[in-house]
């Protein structure tokens, strides 16, 4: 972990070395004095990780407690919370180890630190991939519930949902192991970036289509009730605002990290790209922020889940 100096080693193998197929090396010292580097203290990383940890533990506990929430939709939300939980645990673990090493409290061999770092890298990478997958699964689930409402319960069954969940976790673990093992190959970085773009496109297409369907439905209701046009416009604006927040948070939190991976392939020695490389810690912090925001968007908006959450908190006291 300390090998990168000022940069953390979360997914450090994807950050410190360019692909083997490229004869170039990252040159952060050539970025010049005009680079803007945002410093993220370890204490802030630890705080963000703990907040995310508490939030997502509460989501998992609430869904596990309430049998009314034992449905495919909430299982996908629960798995998203578990993915974000792994992001938080990885962050807290790495930050704690880094602080102990810097303070001289923890003394260990470099080989042990490297092995621990590899484990954390696999954990964080698998949690990132699974988080993106479950965000896509939630979008598909909502799409089916709107466009195939009468067939929803025959299409999205519990056994089928469990198979999808198991496949996502297995694929995420295998992907993370392969990514960390073959981090110095261009194709690995390109596959990760392509996966992010595919998930972003999938979510954008599905949610935009759902918004268009909802607006048409609102127009139909307005015509039946002989309502005026401003009511429909208000619904459309509310839906557009929700869609903007949902996709905007996803893009702002995940986009910079995958831009970083893209630039490692495209311009590892360019001074401007070097400036972006210096903010690797900021990009990781944004991903942790996404783990904080996800429960607010996908879980806490459910009245049933909020009610169960209150019961969980009351029991804990």
Swiss-Prot record:
InterPro entries: GPCR_Rhodpsn, GPCR_Rhodpsn_7TM, Melcrt_ACTH_rcpt, MSH_rcpt
Glycosites: 29
Membrane-side (Cytoplasmic) residue stretches: 64-72, 141-163, 212-240, 301-317
Transmembrane feature ranges: 38-63, 73-93, 119-140, 164-183, 192-211, 241-266, 280-300
A GO cellular component entry from the record: plasma membrane
Disulfide bridge positions per record: none
Compartment annotation: Cell membrane
Keywords linked to the UniProt accession: Cell membrane, G-protein coupled receptor, Glycoprotein, Lipoprotein, Membrane, Palmitate, Receptor, Transducer, Transmembrane, Transmembrane helix
Topological region Extracellular: 1-37, 94-118, 184-191, 267-279
Keyword Transmembrane helix set for record: yes
Residues anchoring lipid (S-palmitoyl cysteine): 315
GO molecular function: melanocyte-stimulating hormone receptor activity
Membrane topology (UniProt): Multi-pass membrane protein
Pfam families to which the protein is assigned, alphabetical: 7tm_1
Record note on quaternary structure: Interacts with MGRN1, but does not undergo MGRN1-mediated ubiquitination; this interaction competes with GNAS-binding and thus inhibits agonist-induced cAMP production. Interacts with OPN3; the interaction results in a decrease in MC1R-mediated cAMP signaling and ultimately a decrease in melanin production in melanocytes.
Protein family membership: Belongs to the G-protein coupled receptor 1 family.
Function in brief: Receptor for MSH (alpha, beta and gamma) and ACTH. The activity of this receptor is mediated by G proteins which activate adenylate cyclase. Mediates melanogenesis, the production of eumelanin (black/brown) and phaeomelanin (red/yellow), via regulation of cAMP signaling in melanocytes.
Protein name in the entry: Melanocyte-stimulating hormone receptor
Organism: Ovibos moschatus (Muskox)
Gene: MC1R
